[in-house]
């Protein structure tokens, strides 16, 4: 179908309006966490499953379908030999698009795709200054439940969690990751307390876990303390205590979600409590001209991006640990 120049302008204006709406919705979601921090735990549980998407797209998918478990494009499912069911509507996301521009005059740049025949010849001869810019367009993805993939094959596409009897083996993978990748030893110790389950020692870059912990709790606490080691080994003195705890809670919950943990109400309460304390501390600092105003999206993005940087390699360590355990069990 051919489009007239006026149609193209109209289409571009409509697309920009839709993009602006998505960007505004992302901001609204972040502001919603300000009003109800308890919902953050549900978001982190969700985001822990979607490390292949950017934090902003995670928010958009979460906003449109909080029960999504695995998403892919229409083409992705086709490439796997399946299809999206008829009548299903996609979930809108932001898709990065790189555009090459060339300099026409001092104050004017033009898309290479819109170059005239003469300009294309000059471009071949490299007579124009060029640069690349990144913009976004609207794309669609579909949850696996919207496709023809049978439920029994879902585990081929995403992890459905681990059995509790595997937690000790998963812990060994987490421990090896901390020690080999973060240079952070993980030790079981007598902490002379029943209530203290573990702590991160920033000046030694070391994790100590209470030796009385059973396997599942030991793994859960290790993931939280690993969050400190990842996010705070260099900035422990610079950040408020409430922010340090909130960030460790946040990334720890994302790791826990990835490994199949359900969140206890006490964890959700603690996360919301730390969030409110962090926000109140920031408001006080702003009043005293010591800080910039609090930006929830900035903190959420930092936590999510840090999680994305580590989860694949951490999963590799865990899988190696599980494989070793399986081999040793077969040899018995």
Regions found by a protein language model. Give the residues of each.
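N-terminal accessory/interface modules of nucleic-acid-binding and processing proteins
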Residues: 1-332
């Amino acid at each position: 179908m051919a489009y007239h120049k006026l149609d193209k302008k109209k289409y571009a204006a409509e697309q920009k309006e839709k993009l602006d709406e998505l960007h505004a919705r992302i901001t609204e979601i972040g502001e919603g966490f300000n009003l109800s921090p308890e919902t953050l735990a549900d978001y982190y549980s969700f985001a822990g499953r979607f490390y292949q998407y950017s934090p902003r797209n995670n928010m958009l998918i979460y906003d449109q379908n909080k029960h999504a478990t695995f998403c892919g494009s229409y083409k992705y499912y086709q490439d796997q030999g399946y299809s999206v069911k008829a009548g299903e509507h996609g979930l809108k996301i932001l898709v990065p698009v790189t555009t090459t521009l060339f300099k026409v005059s001092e104050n004017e740049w033009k898309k290479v795709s819109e170059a005239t025949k003469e300009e294309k010849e000059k471009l071949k001869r490299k007579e124009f200054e060029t640069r690349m810019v990144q913009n976004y367009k609207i794309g669609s993805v579909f949850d696996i439940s919207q496709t023809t993939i049978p439920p029994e094959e879902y585990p081929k596409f995403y992890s459905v969690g681990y059995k509790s009897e595997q937690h000790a083996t998963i812990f060994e993978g987490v421990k090896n990751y901390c020690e080999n990748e973060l240079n952070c030893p993980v030790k079981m110790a007598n902490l002379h307390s029943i209530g203290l389950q573990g702590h991160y020692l920033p000046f030694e870059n070391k994790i100590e876990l209470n030796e009385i912990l059973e396997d599942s709790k030991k793994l859960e606490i290790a993931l939280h303390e690993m969050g400190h080691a990842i996010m705070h080994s260099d900035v422990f003195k610079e950040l408020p205590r409430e922010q340090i705890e909130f960030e460790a809670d946040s990334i720890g919950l994302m790791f826990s979600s990835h490994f199949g943990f359900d969140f206890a109400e006490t964890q959700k309460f603690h996360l919301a409590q730390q969030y409110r304390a962090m926000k109140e501390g920031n408001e006080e600092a702003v009043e005293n001209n010591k800080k910039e105003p609090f930006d929830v999206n900035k903190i959420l993005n930092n936590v999510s991006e840090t999680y994305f940087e580590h989860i694949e390699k951490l999963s590799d360590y865990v899988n190696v640990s599980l494989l070793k355990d399986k081999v040793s069990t077969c040899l018995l």
